[in-house]
């Protein structure tokens, strides 16, 4: 097999669903760059994360440089650039949550799951990520699991909280 054939067969390809959804979304914006975040969300929804190869493929559909898509993908913390677990735990590490007991809650989550921040459990069930602020300062320390916000989290309640996401 020639090198050019190898490159062609290994090239990332958007699914027809992804491509048509991105093209549809693109028509809602005057500037195709504005559709890049939606395009990234489309790929992530289909695949669970955004592989490196998706960046130039999205750029090609939108007619913009891959570097523009990359800039958006790296800016937004909700775009995952590596595989993540079925459930995403986002722990707030703002000053208010830190003072409210963030470290002990994170420590208990790490102990229960056997992972550190930025890691995924071996069974692919959970990914643990820090976030700057969840806007739930009146209930610090706070965390989110998927789309559910939990406030006033205490270390002794972590096991029960995690069990709800089996």
Swiss-Prot record:
Which EC class, in a word? translocase
- E.C. number: 7.1.1.-
Q: Where are the transmembrane segments?
A: none
Q: Which UniProt keywords apply?
A: 2Fe-2S, Iron, Iron-sulfur, Metal-binding, NAD, Quinone, Translocase, Ubiquinone
Q: Which InterPro entries match?
A: NuoE-like, NuoE_dom, NuoE_N, Thioredoxin-like_sf
Lineage: superkingdom = Bacteria
**Catalytic activities:** a quinone + NADH + 5 H(+)(in) = a quinol + NAD(+) + 4 H(+)(out)
Give a Pfam family name: 2Fe-2S_thioredx
Residue runs in coiled coils: none
One BP annotation, GO = respiratory electron transport chain
Q: Which cofactor does it need?
A: [2Fe-2S] cluster
Q: What positions does the entry give for [2Fe-2S] cluster binding?
A: 92, 97, 133, 137
Question: What protein family is recorded?
Answer: Belongs to the complex I 24 kDa subunit family.
Q: What role is this protein assigned?
A: NDH-1 shuttles electrons from NADH, via FMN and iron-sulfur (Fe-S) centers, to quinones in the respiratory chain. The immediate electron acceptor for the enzyme in this species is believed to be ubiquinone. Couples the redox reaction to proton translocation (for every two electrons transferred, four hydrogen ions are translocated across the cytoplasmic membrane), and thus conserves the redox energy in a proton gradient.
Q: Which NCBIfam families match?
A: nuoE_fam (TIGR01958), PRK07539.1-2 (NF005722)
- Known PANTHER family for this protein? NADH DEHYDROGENASE [UBIQUINONE] FLAVOPROTEIN 2, MITOCHONDRIAL (PTHR10371:SF3), NADH DEHYDROGENASE UBIQUINONE FLAVOPROTEIN 2, MITOCHONDRIAL (PTHR10371)
Q: Which proteins does it associate with, and in what oligomeric form? A: Composed of 13 different subunits. Subunits NuoCD, E, F, and G constitute the peripheral sector of the complex.
Protein's name according to its UniProt entry? NADH-quinone oxidoreductase subunit E
What is the originating organism of this protein? Pseudomonas aeruginosa (strain ATCC 15692 / DSM 22644 / CIP 104116 / JCM 14847 / LMG 12228 / 1C / PRS 101 / PAO1)
Q: Which gene encodes it?
A: nuoE
């Amino acid at each position: 097999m020639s090198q050019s054939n190898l490159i062609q067969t290994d090239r990332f390809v958007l699914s027809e669903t992804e491509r048509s959804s991105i093209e549809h979304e693109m028509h809602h914006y005057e500037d195709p760059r504005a559709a890049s975040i939606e395009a990234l969300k489309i790929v992530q929804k289909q695949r669970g994360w955004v592989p490196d190869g998706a960046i130039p493929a999205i750029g090609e559909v939108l007619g913009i440089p891959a570097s523009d898509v990359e800039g958006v993908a790296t800016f937004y913390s909700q775009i995952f650039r590596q595989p993540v677990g079925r459930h995403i735990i986002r722990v707030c590490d703002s000053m208010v949550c830190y003072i409210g007991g963030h470290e002990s809650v994170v420590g208990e989550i790490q102990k229960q799951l056997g992972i550190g921040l930025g890691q995924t459990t071996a069974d692919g069930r959970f990914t643990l990520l820090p976030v700057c602020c969840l806007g739930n300062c009146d209930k610090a320390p706070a965390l989110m699991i998927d789309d559910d916000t939990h406030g006033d989290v205490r270390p002794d309640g972590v096991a029960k909280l995690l069990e709800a996401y089996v």
